A protein has these predicted regions:
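Canonical tetratricopeptide repeat
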Residues: 60-64, 98, 102, 152, ...
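Residue-level recognition of tetratricopeptide repeat
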Residues: 33, 67, 101-105, 155, ...
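TPR/TPR-like (Sel1-like) alpha-helical repeat modules
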Residues: 119-127, 243-244, 260, 268-287, ...
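N-terminal leader/linker segments that initiate helical-solenoid repeat arrays
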Residues: 19-76, 80, 92-98, 309, ...
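Register position in tetratricopeptide repeats
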Residues: 71, 109-110, 159, 192-196, ...
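Flexible helix-coil transition and linker loops at the boundaries of alpha-helical arrays
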Residues: 49-60, 86-98, 125-146, 174-183, ...
């Protein structure tokens, strides 16, 4: 019994000897946290961690050093203190989101540990969604954190060349934050994807830019992506929007091609197709000749009342027939005087002369009609030049 009493007394003395040390550590932490000067606070917190390894408030001290702005602080310190705080745990969701945001941002800005940065960013969005109804912060703050997490993830994925994943993350971020900068990020990604012939992903990236900012570059590139993906009706709408913003020969040519294909099924689209093809013939150096040829072909094919091609064929046939008649006539009667001809020969000659006259009249008529059709097309060309201000 006496030995037990001595043992209990010794244990009490030992425990009492620990209390000043623990209280001293707690006092140091409280002093550091209540210090108003950021630089002094940082110094005191570092001393606290160095002098009290495994202390009760180690997680909070590391968390504070991660988020605190003080002179001489390096990205490496932000990362080190932040990851230590995350490792120790015990932080509320809001503080954890703040630390994850800072650490992920450091990794992204350095272009290092991008997979980890992406994972941290995803955790931010997930934590914020889970705590949207908590009392730690207003719902608006959690929404901002959801958007920030998605945006950071997009940056990390973009730097790691995972463009498809980056597009998805940026879209999530924009849907929450509505920040115009995200549109520019999506436009840049969309262009990279388009240049890499990833047209479906490019379309996804460019849609928000085209439908929200509506600037020329976004609308035109989005129209190109739609066109590459076979969505010609949607592409046509955005090409027209882009053409209103800037009279580009390339755009006019694309519009003309789409409308010309529609005109093959419905002639009512022919005039509009002609307008854009003729515009392209003057505005697009690369496609000028092809656009003019397409316009000419469409003009004559679509004018059923003119029947230009049919009349050209008739003209060729009449010319050939006239040539044959003339040759036959000359062979039979070219070197003979009329007095030398028999009555039957005179009758035949008269008949051939009548046929020659008929063909000559036919050729004259067809030539006038085809010339009128050509002049009609030329008038379209002149009106196009006038509309575009071309001398």
């Amino acid at each position: 019994m006496r030995k037990s009493a001595i043992a209990l007394l010794a244990l009490s003395v030992f425990l009492c000897s620990l209390l000043p040390a623990q209280n001293s550590g707690s006092d140091a932490y409280v002093k550091a946290m209540t210090t108003p000067d950021a630089n002094e606070k940082a110094r005191l917190l570092k001393d606290y961690l160095n002098n009290n390894p495994g202390a009760q408030y180690e997680n909070f001290a590391n968390a504070e050093l991660c988020t605190l702005q003080y002179t001489g602080k390096t990205p490496a310190e932000t990362i080190r203190y932040g990851e230590r705080a995350l490792e120790l745990g015990g932080l509320d969701a809001l503080k954890k989101c703040q630390i994850l945001t800072l650490v992920a941002s450091m990794y992204v800005s350095q272009g290092q540990n991008l997979a980890k940065a992406s994972d941290y960013a995803a955790q931010i969005a997930q934590l914020a969604r889970s705590n949207r109804n908590s009392d730690l912060a207003p719902a608006a703050t959690w929404n901002q954190l959801i958007g920030a997490g998605s945006y950071l993830q997009g940056q990390a994925l973009e730097k790691s060349k995972n463009y498809r994943g980056a597009v998805s993350a940026y879209i999530d971020a924009y849907n929450v934050l509505k920040n115009p900068q995200i549109i520019q990020d999506l436009l840049k990604l969309g262009k990279a994807l388009y240049d890499g012939k990833a047209y479906k992903d490019a379309e996804t990236a460019l849609k928000i830019a085209a439908t929200n900012s509506k600037d020329f570059a976004s609308v035109y590139l989005y129209a190109n992506a739609l066109n590459k993906n076979g969505k010609t009706e949607e592409a046509l709408s955005y090409y027209k929007q882009a053409y209103l913003k800037q009279k580009s020969g390339a755009i006019a040519f694309n519009i003309g091609i789409i409308l010309a294909k529609k005109a093959e099924r419905d002639a009512s689209f022919a005039d509009e197709a002609l307008k854009y093809l003729l515009d392209a013939s003057f505005l697009s150096q690369a496609n000028s000749q092809k656009a003019m040829q397409m316009a000419e072909s469409l003009y004559f094919l679509s004018r059923k009342d003119v029947n230009y091609n049919g009349k050209v064929q008739q003209l060729q046939e009449s010319n050939k027939k006239l040539e044959n008649l003339t040759t036959t006539f000359n062979n039979k009667f070219g070197e003979k005087e009329e007095e030398e001809l028999s009555d039957s020969e005179k009758s035949e000659m008269k008949s051939m002369l009548k046929q020659i006259e008929v063909e000559q009249e036919t050729i004259k008529r067809l030539t006038a009609e085809t010339q009128a059709a050509l002049e009609g097309f030329q008038q379209l060309i002149e009106s196009t030049k006038k509309r575009l201000g071309i001398q």
